[in-house]
A protein has these predicted regions:
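N-terminal glycine-rich phosphate-binding loop and ensuing alpha1 helix
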Residues: 2-51
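Hydrophobic packing residues within well-ordered alpha-helices of enzyme cores
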Residues: 17, 58-62, 116, 146
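Hydrophobic residues at beta-strand termini and immediately following loops
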Residues: 26, 70-72, 126, 169
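Conserved alpha/beta core of the MobA/IspD/sugar-nucleotide pyrophosphorylase nucleotidyltransferase superfamily
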Residues: 1-2, 148-179
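Conserved beta-strand segments of alpha/beta enzyme cores
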Residues: 22, 68, 122, 165-167
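Short beta-strand segments
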Residues: 9-11, 101-102, 126-127, 170-172
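Conserved N-terminal catalytic core of the sugar/cofactor nucleotidyltransferase
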Residues: 33-97, 111
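Conserved beta-loop-beta/alpha segment of the NTase-like Rossmann-fold superfamily
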Residues: 76-144
Length: 179
């Protein structure tokens, strides 16, 4: 199996909720600690958490978990795509492929992560009932082509416009898109 790292995006303002989603309780822990632990249990390494809003609080909260941090200092005026770019840049030289997912989808099932790790494809996207979600896994040698896109349609648009085949993995896990 190819060495897989992960980018956990946590830079957003949590504007749809009043609370800071990465710090919300989940399963005896918090959303962010649960997500990091789940990835570590699958031997995904390195893991970089892209912070922005309330960066110091989240970085302190996860400091004991052996993850890297990258800050999107412009989180108020940039999109998730920009945070993904920062995270990928931080770990691309340390792995062969990168799993990308937001930090706030704790209902994602470990079995879904296991399934994605078994598939070797330039770009792998999870789907549930025909709807795309996370995680997405992209081989590191594909990123230069994806970065040629300006990100105006996010990572999904950049992947679709790259011309690189996308392998869709249908899973029975609505956690791939439930935040």
């Amino acid at each position: 199996m190819k060495k897989t790292g992960a980018v956990l995006v946590a830079a957003g303002l949590s504007s749809r909720m009043k609370d800071f989603k990465p710090m919300l309780p989940f399963g005896g822990s918090t959303v962010s600690r649960h997500m990091v632990s789940m990835l570590k249990d699958m031997d995904i390494d390195p893991i970089v958490v892209v912070t922005g809003y309330r960066a110091e609080q989240l970085e302190s909260h996860l400091s004991h978990m052996s993850v890297r941090f990258v800050r999107n200092e412009r989180y108020r005026e940039t999109e998730m795509f920009d945070s993904i770019c920062l995270g990928v840049e931080a770990i691309a030289s340390d792995c062969e492929r990168i799993m990308i997912l937001p930090i706030d989808i704790p209902a994602l099932m470990p079995e879904t992560i296991r399934q994605t790790l078994m598939i070797d494809a330039p770009i792998l996207r999870t789907m549930c009932k025909g709807e795309p979600g996370h995680p997405i896994i992209i081989q590191t040698d594909v990123f230069p082509v994806i970065w040629q896109n300006d990100g105006h349609r996010g990572l999904r648009g950049a992947m679709e416009e790259s011309g690189i085949p996308i392998t869709n993995l249908e899973v029975e896990d609505e956690g791939i898109y439930k935040d």
